[in-house]
């Protein structure tokens, strides 16, 4: 694998994601009617036996819980692909309530840092036509912390927002199947820069979240409501997000630290 430039990292991710297979089948429970040892001729046979003997419970159908499971699987897959890059790429995994889910660097990208965040969205199913939108707006960023103050190193981040050469989202779009233990049908992975799928609306009425466009084809084509990244950042950094007491205290602390840090450090 040779040097990967910023646009090519996005294409590299797209290529890898084409080969991702959603193979989560349920939650294993020890209790069941199996007479051990169990013998299976292939994976599908094993799955069927575990299901028939009561060992396979359904994954959660609640969107946030299911998304967490799917995100872990996708990050694991990408980490395996990065590990197979022959040292061209390296990666660090984020934690819970952390941005990004995956930080990519390495000699293949000139030692620069790239933020790769995983988003999961359910298709909005209607009786009249095939799905054309997500059930709700994907959250691109938390608008009142690291995004609004990109030179500060906020808790829950590897480094300041502005230190990244590029921000990329891997978006998993699926149809919920309530009748299977895996819960997921027709998973599609889309890789886009967040600003290219940005809308002018929040993704929550109660939280300070920046929302994406709803249209599935708009997500695929990177057809958001902003013509340029500069327009996206200008609009959302001027947005009147609420800043609660906890966030305000943290902001004041970070600003004080920045003032005390000598230039060049």
Where are these regions (language model features)?
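Nucleic-acid endonuclease domains
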Residues: 1-98, 107-111, 120-265
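A generic, well-ordered mixed alpha/beta core segment in the N-terminal half of proteins
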Residues: 102-103, 116-119
């Amino acid at each position: 694998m040779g040097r990967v430039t910023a646009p090519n990292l996005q294409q590299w991710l797209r290529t890898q994601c084409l080969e991702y297979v959603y193979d989560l089948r349920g939650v294993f429970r020890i209790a069941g009617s199996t007479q051990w040892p169990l013998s299976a001729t292939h994976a599908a046979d094993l799955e069927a036996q575990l299901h028939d003997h009561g060992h396979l419970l359904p994954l959660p159908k609640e969107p946030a819980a299911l998304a967490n499971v799917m995100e872990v699987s996708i990050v694991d897959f990408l980490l395996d692909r990065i590990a197979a890059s022959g040292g061209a790429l390296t990666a660090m995994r984020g934690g819970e309530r952390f941005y990004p889910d995956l930080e990519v660097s390495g000699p293949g990208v000139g030692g620069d840092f790239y933020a790769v965040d995983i988003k999961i969205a359910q298709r909005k199913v209607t009786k009249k036509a095939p799905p054309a939108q997500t059930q709700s707006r994907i959250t691109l960023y938390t608008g009142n912390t690291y995004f609004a103050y990109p030179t500060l190193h906020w808790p829950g981040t590897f480094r300041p927002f502005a230190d990244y050469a590029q921000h990329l989202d891997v978006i998993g779009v699926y149809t919920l199947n309530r009748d299977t233990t895996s819960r997921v049908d027709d998973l599609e992975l889309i890789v886009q820069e967040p600003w290219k799928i940005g809308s002018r609306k929040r993704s929550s009425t109660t939280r300070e979240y920046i929302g994406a466009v709803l249209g599935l084809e708009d997500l695929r084509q990177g057809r958001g409501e902003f013509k340029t990244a500069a327009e996206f950042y200008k609009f959302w950094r001027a947005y009147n997000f609420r800043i609660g007491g906890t966030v305000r205290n943290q902001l004041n602390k970070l600003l004080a630290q920045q003032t005390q840090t000598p230039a060049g450090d």
